[in-house]
Swiss-Prot record:
<feature type="transmembrane region" description="Helical">
    <location>
        <begin position="15"/>
        <end position="31"/>
    </location>
</feature>
<keyword id="KW-0472">Membrane</keyword>
<keyword id="KW-0482">Metalloprotease</keyword>
<keyword id="KW-0812">Transmembrane</keyword>
<dbReference type="InterPro" id="IPR041569">
    <property type="entry name" value="AAA_lid_3"/>
</dbReference>
<keyword id="KW-0479">Metal-binding</keyword>
<feature type="binding site">
    <location>
        <position position="319"/>
    </location>
    <ligand>
        <name>Zn(2+)</name>
    </ligand>
</feature>
<dbReference type="InterPro" id="IPR003593">
    <property type="entry name" value="AAA+_ATPase"/>
</dbReference>
<dbReference type="GO" id="GO:0005524">
    <property type="term" value="F:ATP binding"/>
</dbReference>
<feature type="binding site">
    <location>
        <position position="315"/>
    </location>
    <ligand>
        <name>Zn(2+)</name>
    </ligand>
</feature>
<comment type="function">
    <text>Acts as a processive, ATP-dependent zinc metallopeptidase for both cytoplasmic and membrane proteins. Plays a role in the quality control of integral membrane proteins.</text>
</comment>
<dbReference type="InterPro" id="IPR037219">
    <property type="entry name" value="Peptidase_M41-like"/>
</dbReference>
<keyword id="KW-0862">Zinc</keyword>
<dbReference type="Pfam" id="PF17862">
    <property type="entry name" value="AAA_lid_3"/>
</dbReference>
<dbReference type="GO" id="GO:0008270">
    <property type="term" value="F:zinc ion binding"/>
</dbReference>
<keyword id="KW-1003">Cell membrane</keyword>
<dbReference type="Pfam" id="PF01434">
    <property type="entry name" value="Peptidase_M41"/>
</dbReference>
Amino acid sequence: MNPRPVRPGGSLQQSLLALGSLSVAVGLAVWQQRTLGRGRSDSVTAVERPETTFSDVAGLIEAKEELAEIVTFLRDPERFRRMGARMPRGVLLAGPPGTGKTLLARAVAGEAGVPFFAMSASQFVEVYVGVGAKRVRDLFAAARKASPAIVFIDEIDAIGRRRGDSQSHQEYEQTLNQVLVELDGFHPRQAVVVIAATNRSDILDPALLRPGRFDRRVELSLPDRAERAAILRVHAQDKPLAPDVDLDALAARTVGLSGADLENTLNEAALLALRRGGDEITQADLEEAVDRVIAGPSRRSRALSARERETIAVHEAGHALVAHQLASADAPRRVTILGRGQMGGATVLAPDEDRRLWTRGQFLDRLAVLLGGYAAEEYRYGEVTTGSSGDLSQASALAQAMVTTYGMGKSLRGRAFDANGPVSDETSRAIDEEVSALVSEALELASRTIANAAHLLDALVAALLAEETLDEARLAAILGPRPARPAMN
């Protein structure tokens, strides 16, 4: 064994060098954490006084009425104290994306004339532990100093997810805990209201929703027809509209679009008008803009064989014809064989009035419309194509919901089943049989409707092949008046 020579002091020098490297690494990490935390914390204290008011928010009447009390409290908190009334510390705005949650929060601050501190919940959290909690403390400290004030936390589900959830994380939980501490720590004389927004209220931690925290909940839903018309008018105020523009008609065919979608529709229409060199937005621009928002731009350059083009026309004509002939179905408003996105063509349907309740008969008509393209292909060619795959998926999902959610089956009438819950093999087979029976019944209805009005199917197909797109007026000229719709079918 040959011992290795060791220079005097070598091990000490190496130890000191290693210790120095470790100190530098730790120092850099601490500096980086403080720098990042400080940089983002400084942005937390940025404050504004919005000029937005409730008059800038079209629709949402009930939500504005609910929040008017918050405005009164922020304007005159002493009045509430004299009455011994405790205002909610937190207000949760819950609803689908684009329904105006942020706009409404800004309008509350604008109406009250108070400072508005806004952050997205995802901005609180970094990879470093403790940074999120520090930003929460900084945000609430700034709001207390500026009292009366509003703190707005957008997408609070980013940090407010139910603790113990498989997708939760230690830093998110610490940040949530700090938010809870701050909500509990308000002094009675501090007029600070916290407004949070979420699309997923179902996953929020119950501790957020208990009294004294976010104990006032305001649900925002997609706008109804009257609200859509009001939203369109608000966003059309600064845009030149041609005399043929009918915003009420546009509101009728934009069922399911949010306020943000409607704003985007008008902006798209303005861009389309500029693209064609026009000085005004026409109804045609608006119709094309709706199609773009819903399904994307048309694909005119896509090469199709004559048979494929005809098949698409037959398929879309089938949807439109069944929708027109069935009294309880939504009316066809626009049909096109121009491809958009992954779709070969499209049939746009819209009810004469918004619905809140559906009967089994109405759902059955809706199923028949979904299967109208399938039935038309089968009637014309004796076989079907892959173009019906999306329709079949939607029809199957609706039939499943009718049986398992709405109790509209026959052998399982009046019963509901948890979609993710366990059921016996016998019940599972019964559900499958009920769903299959509903789809078969709807397909038979669609096929019978098309066979009884084959001349109208031929007329629609010919018009689509010649014109590519048919609007509501053109459809009415070809198909004639619709059957009278019963009040409840």
